[in-house]
């Protein structure tokens, strides 16, 4: 299942951090492909879905636009194709999870040391010290242990996406750096309805329920039935 979530975050919490504006979240999701054949001018199914939802929400008319996702290349391919002027941000907690997993691989017998090492990397990440962070990872790439592969993957993941990890600058700009709203949408719109005990779904059936859930959670349920009624009368 692929999910597109749109929200605004002009509100601030007590510490001045951006929080989503109440009632601003909308969802659109389905089991469909995000892949586009090489040299094809036809957008993928999911790209078209994203374009419909962003058009509906007038995303491109906003003063500032941001695309938040994990490090998956297909997300950034869609973002670059559809919204070349949007700021791209890798979810900060995804990056920290990668660093935490690496810390455990580097110090499997010493959880306290792993936690300390990870926290030092977190601080470098949050403070915008990406060069220092990459420098701290580099020596472990040359080791002969199994953790060298993990270190190499983490290093290249951060290096490849470093322009999307300028979290100090993003915070100064008042931008969200977490995709928590998207993660919550995956749970509320998808998992709690489709992943109950004993359930089995066809793609057609699951997509129908997903569409219905997204309509309800996006506050478009009544609009959906009104449009359906108009189409039936026109037919």
Labelled PLM ranges:
Residues 1-235:
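Catalytic center-proximal scaffold of phosphoryl-transfer enzymes
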């Amino acid at each position: 299942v692929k999910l597109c979530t749109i929200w605004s975050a002009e509100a601030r919490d007590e510490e001045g951090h951006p929080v989503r504006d109440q009632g601003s979240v909308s969802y659109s999701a389905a089991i469909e492909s995000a892949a586009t054949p090489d040299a094809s001018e036809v957008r993928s199914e999911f790209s078209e879905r994203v374009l419909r939802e962003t058009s509906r929400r007038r995303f491109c008319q906003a003063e500032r636009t941001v695309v938040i996702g994990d490090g998956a290349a297909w997300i950034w391919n869609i973002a670059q194709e559809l919204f070349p002027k949007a700021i791209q941000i890798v979810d900060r907690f995804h990056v920290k999870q990668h660093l935490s997993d690496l810390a455990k691989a580097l110090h499997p017998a010493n959880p306290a040391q792993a936690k300390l090492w990870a926290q030092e990397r977190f601080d470098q990440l949050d403070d915008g010290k990406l060069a220092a962070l990459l420098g701290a990872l580099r020596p472990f790439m040359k080791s002969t242990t199994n953790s060298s592969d993990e270190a190499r993957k983490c290093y290249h993941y951060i290096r490849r996406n470093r322009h999307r990890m300028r979290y100090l600058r993003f915070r100064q700009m008042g931008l969200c750096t977490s995709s928590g709203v998207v993660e919550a949408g995956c749970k509320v719109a998808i998992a709690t309805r489709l992943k109950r005990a004993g359930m089995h779904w066809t793609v057609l059936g699951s997509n129908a329920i997903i569409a219905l859930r997204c309509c309800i959670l996006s506050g478009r349920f009544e609009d959906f039935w009104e449009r359906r009624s108009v189409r039936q009368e026109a037919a």
